[in-house]
Amino acid sequence: MIRAVLFDLDGTLLNRNLSLRKFIEDQHIRLNLKHIPIDQYISRFIKLDQHGYVWKDKVYAKLIEELKIKDLTASQLLKDYLSFFPRHCTPFDNLEKMLVTIKQQNIKLGMISNGFSQFQMDNIKALKIDHYFDTILISEYEGIKKPDREIFMRGLSKLGVSPKESIFVGDHPVNDIEAAKKAGMKTIWKKNTHFSHAPAADYCVTDLFEIIDIIEREKGKEV
């Protein structure tokens, strides 16, 4: 019986690629970086960012060096990122519709995200989905991060469910899918352009609303 569905945030619920591109374009305009071609600023930022796995203080330090940015420090640019990125947070299609449908089935919702607590919470609130979740675990606050099995078990404990009663949805084949599978959970891989496949996934989806059909299929196995 499926009693809980837990999610990753970036690349799963939050369309980070689109959100980041919107933010970078806005930052380029707001901070009057017109001496740098906007396409160059965007492409170098995205390359240095490495899908979010490089923190922005390092990204900005490198941008300042490479693009000869003057009158702005890395810390000033980072502060701008922390303040303005949430304003550009864009969900994947059918996010809220999917969450509402799951909640209507009396299934608990959880989120497990790697990152800095305040920044991630700002992004979750920007998507206006925080009220749907029964528990949200962010690695900085928890002191552990995915793929550590403990953060998954902690999330399940907070929801009062066992691994066999839960599904984890994520975009990273190792940190999300393989790790959740090792914790004993069913897994759904949110397909993306960063990774070609996720061998440990029980299911794969391109649209979030496909998760509803998977929940129904899992219910059918219980009969």
Please state what every model-predicted region is.
Residues 2-93:
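N-terminal helical cap/lid subdomain that shapes the substrate entry/recognition surface
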